[in-house]
Structure formats: structure tokens, C-alpha cells
Amino acid sequence: MGNLAELLKSRDNNFNFIRMVAAFFVLVSHSYPLSRGAAETEPLMAQLGITLGGLGVFTFFCISGFFISLSYERSKTKIDFVVARFLRLYPGLLVVLLLSAWVVGPLFTELSLHDYFSAKEVHRYITGNLKLKDIQFQLPGLFQDNPYPGINGSLWTLYYEVLLYAMVFALGVVGCLTRLRRVSVFF
């Protein structure tokens, strides 16, 4: 068994398993209010003081912080880091937003296609959500009878992911991510 640096060079490190468990926690946690309404919380909330979803999201952010720091350390230049973070986030986000607004929305809306595509909210859903601030979760006529009539409820996390990118970048610029400074900052 190698040290952490050696284990991270391969994909044999169980992070995918941890991500799968965290995703399952979020799925279970969200199933209660999505199927039964906002007042319904998962049964373990009273015993744990945190939902499984909260624990899953916390786990995702911890893993992200670890890998984002690793990305900064492996980047040849600061520009490489910024470009890598942009390319990690925005192409996938754009695809999700376009598919949601232009495929899922038209297939499941209660409106006519003309009314759906004429609504300003469809275009704002794409352009506004690319800004990652004040996320718009609803599309016109889509899932209106659901306890939560939105789509892509997890988009809110991306704003905090970008804040984490900025924090790692700032810590790297001031030298807190170098091996010697890491020890002095945390001890």
C-alpha cells in the first residue's frame, strides 16, 4: 500500500465509491420532500441532526476541495488552473441547461410549444443560470403539479464550487498550498 500521493496517481483510490454513496444519500434525502411535499423530511433527520442529503453534499464538497487543490498543484501555470476549472464546469453546464430548456421542457410542459418557446423564462433559464447566481429552477408549464415544480435543483451547488475554485486559487497565489507553508498554516 502506497502513500496518498502514490494512490492518487491511479484511479484505484475509492473516491468513485465514496461519490456513489454520497449521491445515494442525496437521492434518498430528496425523495421525501419531492414525493411527499416540503414538510416531509427523512426519518433519520431527528436522530442525526443532519439529513443524508446534507451529509452527501458535505462529502461532495470535501472531495471537491481535495481534487481542486490537487488540480492547482498539478497545473503548470495559474492560467492553466483557471482554464481547467472553466472547462470542467461550463461545457457540461451548458449542455445540461440546453437539454433541460430545449428537450425536457418542450417534451413535458403543459403549454403549447409556441407558448413555451415564446416565454422569456426559457431563454433566461439558460443565460441566467450560466451566471451561477440567483439560479432559476422553473421552466414554464413544467412539473407544475409536483411538490417542487423545478428542474435541476442541484445547480445551486455550482456557485459554491466556483467560490471554492477562487479560494484555492487565492491560497495558491499567496503560497499556502506549497508543502512547507501547508504545515505552518494548519499547525
Spans of features found by a protein language model:
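Short, Lys/Arg-rich, polar N-terminal cytosolic tail immediately upstream
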Residues: 1-12
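Juxtamembrane transmembrane-helix termini
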Residues: 2, 56-87, 92-115
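Membrane-interface helix-boundary motifs at transmembrane edges
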Residues: 12, 76-81, 174-182
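Functionally critical transmembrane alpha-helices in membrane proteins and complexes, commonly lining
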Residues: 12-72, 90-93
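Structural signal for membrane-spanning alpha-helices in multi-pass inner-membrane proteins
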Residues: 30-33, 100, 104, 172
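Transmembrane helix-loop junctions in multipass membrane proteins, especially transporters and channels
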Residues: 35-42, 74-75, 105-113, 177-181
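Membrane-interface helix-loop-helix regions
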Residues: 48-54, 90, 94-162, 166
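Solvent-exposed interhelical
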Residues: 162-187
